[in-house]
Amino acid sequence: MPFTFHDTVRWVKNLAKIFRVEDKGSALVALKEKKYREEIGLIMQKTVGKRVIISSSGPDISWVLEIVRECGMEIIRAGYLSSPYLMKDKQKISDISIIPDYTLEKLYDDIKTYRPDLVLTTIWLDHKKANVRYGMIPFCPNVGFFGALSSMKHWTSILFGPVTEGWRNYL
């Protein structure tokens, strides 16, 4: 299933061609693209130039790389934690170096060294070790024109919260 806007556009156009309703497919894409561009524009006001580290044990992070880039964020590191679910050879975006076997220790070292604005990961981080804003990458992201965008909206909101919430003082 398509997670990103661009994947969904290709999917809709292919289906429209199969069913010989290209005009309806194009109309749907145009309608959704207008809304998508508006939403991306709002998000970019908050994300352009922000630095992010991406660390995943999930099967495919290409959709995360795509939406993060589209929102103008700088990807400092992207890596796969060891996992039986990996599909490293199926990555659609290959212009950055994705680190295979990215260890948790290396992730914490990179957080300390590069001080990113945000870490996106599939694992819970030790807040005392990480001391960084981080968001979870869903194993089953939303699909469709606005699938990846919904995750990006959530991650954007994390950028403006405190690094450590008050309740954590009691842990």
Residue ranges with predicted function:
Residues 1-171:
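An N-terminal assembly and electron-transfer interface module characteristic of large anaerobic redox
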